[in-house]
Amino acid sequence: FLKSVSDRIYVATKAGRQINPHVAEGYYDKALMESYVDQSLLNLNVETIDLLQMHCPPTEVYSSDNTFEMLDYLVSKGKIQNYGFSVQTVDEALECIKRPNTKSIQVIFNIFRQKPAEKLFKIAKEKKVAIIVRVPLASGLLTGKFNKDSSFAPDDHRNYNINGDAFDVGETFSGVNFNKALEAVDELKNILPEGITLSQLSLKWILMHDAVSIVIPGAKNKDH
């Protein structure tokens, strides 16, 4: 399907998180990373990947020449067209966009986590680097569907990582205390314009920042 509409659909994917152990050296291994890309090409049934993103690698990867040599190599082979980075911090993003061939930054940004707008957005816009916003609804908080009695399955990161025990706490509820966030959500509901959901307001607020290229909310089912 994707191959037949390649002139209308841009394919973006991530790579690197499957490196085990998840250490920087894996990101410098051309053969290893190329094998991941080859598998993605096979899985997606496309001839090239429009955007390959490094998936939240160890911090030292962002400043290493080896990283960019590996990515430029994949571009030269025609297996990817562009590359970018999914980051956990603004400092990591700023390090990435120092490099001229970085085309995108994927970063957490929402009403509860606004730091990227303080500095990153301006520089990214100047350098014409796309901003892809992930976790725009703060792991579902900004849907307005949760309350203090809400519970999550044992294998849901909103259960086991609520305090950052498994990985960066910012990846779950944007690092905001759950109960405190519920209070803020109630205040937001009180100022919602008629006919607009909290999810719609939250996504629109993000897109009002002209540095933002696209927002990628998560969905677990067709209704979402």
Residue ranges and their predicted role:
Residues 57-224:
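Beta/alpha (TIM)-barrel catalytic core signal, keyed to glycine-rich beta->alpha loops juxtaposed to Asp/Glu
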Residues 1-10, 41-46, 75, 96-100:
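Acidic (Asp/Glu)-rich catalytic clusters
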Residues 27-45, 87-95, 202:
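Short, acidic/polar
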Residues 18-34, 59-60:
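Active-site mouth loops of central-metabolism enzymes
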